[in-house]
Structures are given as structure tokens and as C-alpha cells.
Amino acid sequence: TGEKPFMCTKCGKCLSTKQKLNLHHMTHTGEKPFTCTECGKGFSRNDYLKIHQTIHTGEKPFTCIECGKGFSINRTLKLHYMTHTGEKPFTCTECSKGFSTKRDLEIHQTMHTGEKPLTCTECSKGFSTKHKLSIHQRVHTGEKPFTCTECNKGFSRNDHLQIHQTVHTGEKPFTCTECSKCFSRKELLKIHQIVH
């Protein structure tokens, strides 16, 4: 029916069930009773823990019908699918650039405002998004949740793991438009292009 009779006394948000209200309360208390057995990271909800655990298992049950790329959660697949359809329903009021998700738009808008509302408790460095702060905090914690299946080397970021894996695969996806020489990393291509 769409009825949401349970209201949070902290922020006024209304939810449809008492259970959802209890889960929501954890966003205010910071309580994280669900813990990953692999890395010890805590979560406020069990479904968030299950999504996180796919980082360790490598499980990607949701597959894009266009390109065959696998995803650990259905929502990420739906967002990815927009790269094929070109759908960008969220538009920046400053520069008219379009985005496929509201979150991407919000992240982009911090470029215009220069806003960095999130601060690292360890070093006071400011960040525009929770995701960027979370990645940065691994510098302090030493957490490396992304592991190479070939050599077991750990990485703090997934993109760093993907770059590393080209050592094993021999893949060189970055090609020089001038001479067709291939490189495993974008930075190496940029250094090479100075020659031309």
C-alpha cells in the first residue's frame, strides 16, 4: 500500500516495518553487528555483509546480456547496463553533463562546489564522498581486501588489483595511436607518448 507508519525519532525518516526502522537506527548509532570472517569489517545489515563477502569469494552471479561482464549484485548490473543504453537521467545544473546515477551526479557536483564534507579521523584529510574516504582509510588500517588469485598479493583498491593482474595475463589494453605500441598501464602509455 506504500504506507510507512514507523518514523525515526532522530531524522524523521518513515519506514514501512518495525524491522526496517531498527535497521535504519543503526545508521545513527554506528552499530555494526554483522562481521566479515575474512577481514573483520563490520556491517549494520546482513545483506550488506553478503554483498561485501563477494569481494573475497569473487562470486559474480549477475551477468550483462550485452557484454557478458559479471557483477556481484543486481543493482550494479542495472547501473552498468546504462553504459550500453546510454541512459543518463541525472543532469548537472551547472554544466548540463548527464549521469546514469544520482550518486554519480552528486560526486560530480563536488567538482563545482569544491566541497569535501567528510574528514579522515586519522589525518584530517577531507573527501567529497564516503567511498573516497573509505578507500583512503585503508592507508591507515593497512586493509587489502582485493587479492590476486594467481599469487595471493593483496591490494587496497580493485583498480590496483586489475592493473597488477596484467603481469600474469600479459594483457596490454592501452595502445598508442601514433605507432600502435601496446601497454599494460595507462601511465606507461602517457610516458611513451611524450616520445611522439
From Swiss-Prot:
SUPFAM superfamilies, per database record: beta-beta-alpha zinc fingers
Any Gene Ontology biological process: regulation of transcription by RNA polymerase II
A Gene Ontology molecular function term of the record: RNA polymerase II cis-regulatory region sequence-specific DNA binding
Keywords linked to the UniProt accession: DNA-binding, Metal-binding, Nucleus, Repeat, Zinc, Zinc-finger
Source organism (scientific name): Xenopus laevis
Keyword Zinc found: yes
Protein transport listed as a keyword: no
PANTHER family: ZINC FINGER AND SCAN DOMAIN-CONTAINING, ZINC FINGER AND SCAN DOMAIN-CONTAINING PROTEIN 20
Subcellular location: Nucleus
InterPro entries per UniProt: Znf_C2H2_sf, Znf_C2H2_type
GO cellular component, one term: nucleus
Protein name: Gastrula zinc finger protein xLCGF3.1
Role, per record: May be involved in transcriptional regulation.
Family according to the record: Belongs to the krueppel C2H2-type zinc-finger protein family.
Zinc fingers typed C2H2-type, residue spans: 6-28, 34-56, 62-84, 90-112, 118-140, 146-168, 174-196
